[in-house]
Structure formats: structure tokens, C-alpha cells
């Protein structure tokens, strides 16, 4: 996984057909997905329950691009090795999930993965400034975490601030929540380069009509690129 700031679309399989994950992953990748985003929720840090390491390992068999695993769990550190063994390429933990995010990011890198730090809408950008040297991805939540399909919360000022803080470090700014052809360009103009989209990609399509996924991915990408 090499670093560049080109626009990347990361469909969230939380919005896919749960009965057909393998073919759904194959479909979105064939239709232009750059990363595959996997939302892990524990029913404790967030009020929903999704995928553990065995599910992520099953997804890995189908993912040919980058498997981007977003941990919405607390605690995090005890599970890092399990997600590394499951095949995560990027493992993202929330700054709000514990008191030692620096140690968590170090452990993620030590396990052979790219490290990500996520930040909720109510948390200021300054909360992660001290770990930007050991982060590969900063994930800015533009919804409160826990469920797909929520209404977008504008985080333009926060993204601009983070872009300035990051400077020339090789760190992606990823946006998670409510991304579509209207909201993605706002974030791209502020400095983001990776866009997580669940319903924005999967709405209206299926493994039988994957071209809909392709149109949705292309529309988000084109809108974001036009804002640069």
C-alpha cells in the first residue's frame, strides 16, 4: 500500500447485502472501489454490533484492494493482533476509545498494518495532533458512529485544520459518514482524499445490477475531483 493523495472511494460493506458479502465485495471492486471499508462495532463504544475477526478474515478472501478496518470498539489493544491475523491492511482506532491512543497506534504498526486514528464530530482536531507522526490515516467522522445511513454533519473547518496540522506528512484524511456527490466535494476542497460511502454506493444496486455501484462510485469520485 503506497501513499498518494489521489481521490479514493472506500465503500462501507455495512450497507451491503449481509447474505452475500463475498459477491458484494467482488462487485464493488470490479466497479472501481479503491478500498473496502469494514465497520467493526462492539455494542459498547457504539450502540450497534457488527463484525469480529472471523468475519473480517472471511472478507479478506475476497478483497483484492485495501481492506480498511474501522474499530468502533473499546478497549482496542487486546484485539489488534486478531485483526492483523484476519488480514486488515489499515486498522483505525478512535481517539475517544481509551487514554493511550499513542500506544495503540504504535501497536497497530508493530503488527504490520497501517495505523488510523478516528475522531468523532464532537472531538476537536487538537485531540489527535500529538499522534500525527505515527498515523497513516486520520478518519474524520461526519456522523456520530454506530449506524449507517445517517445525516451528514459538516466538519469542513475541522478537516481544514487537520490538513494544516498534517502538513507534508504522508497521512490520508478519510471522511466517514454521509458521503455522496454533494458532500464529498466539500470535504475534498478542505483537504480530504479518502471517502467512505455506504448507502451512497450501494443504494439502488445489487450483485445482479453492479453497474449501479459503478455509477455511484464514479459520481462521488468525479464530484470530489472537481473540487480540487
Curated annotation (Swiss-Prot):
Its EC number is 5.1.3.1. The gene is rpe. GO terms for molecular function: D-ribulose-phosphate 3-epimerase activity; metal ion binding. It holds the Pfam family Ribul_P_3_epim. Catalyzes the reversible epimerization of D-ribulose 5-phosphate to D-xylulose 5-phosphate. The active site is at 39 (proton acceptor), 176 (proton donor). Belongs to the ribulose-phosphate 3-epimerase family. Its cofactor is a divalent metal cation. GO terms for biological process: pentose catabolic process; pentose-phosphate shunt; reductive pentose-phosphate cycle. Substrate binds at residues 12, 70, 146-149, 176-178, 198-199. SUPFAM superfamilies: Ribulose-phoshate binding barrel. A divalent metal cation binds at residues 37, 39, 70, 176. Keywords: Calvin cycle, Carbohydrate metabolism, Isomerase, Metal-binding. Binds 1 divalent metal cation per subunit. It is an enzyme of class 5 (isomerase). The lineage of its organism: Bacteria, Pseudomonadati, Pseudomonadota, Alphaproteobacteria, Rhodobacterales. It catalyses: D-ribulose 5-phosphate = D-xylulose 5-phosphate. This is Ribulose-phosphate 3-epimerase. Pathway: Carbohydrate degradation. It comes from Rhodobacter capsulatus (Rhodopseudomonas capsulata). PROSITE patterns: RIBUL_P_3_EPIMER_1, RIBUL_P_3_EPIMER_2.
Amino acid at each position: 500500500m503506497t501513499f498518494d493523495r489521489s481521490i479514493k472511494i472506500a465503500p462501507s460493506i455495512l450497507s451491503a447485502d449481509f447474505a452475500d458479502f463475498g459477491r458484494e465485495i467482488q462487485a464493488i471492486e470490479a466497479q472501481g472501489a479503491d478500498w473496502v471499508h469494514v465497520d467493526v462495532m462492539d455494542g459498547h463504544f457504539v450502540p450497534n454490533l457488527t463484525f469480529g475477526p472471523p468475519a473480517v478474515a472471511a472478507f479478506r478472501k475476497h478483497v483484492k484492494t485495501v481492506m480498511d478496518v474501522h474499530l468502533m470498539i473499546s478497549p482496542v489493544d487486546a484485539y489488534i493482533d486478531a485483526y492483523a491475523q484476519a488480514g486488515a491492511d489499515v486498522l483505525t482506532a478512535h481517539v475517544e476509545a481509551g487514554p493511550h491512543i499513542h500506544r495503540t497506534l504504535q501497536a497497530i504498526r508493530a503488527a504490520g498494518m497501517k495505523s488510523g486514528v478516528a475522531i468523532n464530530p464532537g472531538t476537536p482536531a487538537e485531540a489527535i495532533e500529538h499522534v500525527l507522526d505515527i498515523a497513516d490515516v486520520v478518519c474524520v467522522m461526519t456522523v456520530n458512529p454506530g449506524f449507517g445511513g445517517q445525516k451528514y454533519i459538516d466538519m469542513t473547518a475541522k478537516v481544514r485544520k487537520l490538513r494544516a496540522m498534517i502538513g507534508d506528512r504522508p497521512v490520508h484524511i478519510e471522511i466517514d459518514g454521509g458521503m455522496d456527490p454533494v458532500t464529498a466535494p466539500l470535504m475534498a476542497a478542505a483537504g480530504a482524499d479518502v471517502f467512505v460511502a455506504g448507502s451512497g454506493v450501494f443504494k439502488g444496486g445489487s450483485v445482479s445490477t453492479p453497474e449501479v455501484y459503478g455509477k455511484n462510485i464514479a459520481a462521488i469520485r468525479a464530484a470530489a475531483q472537481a473540487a480540487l
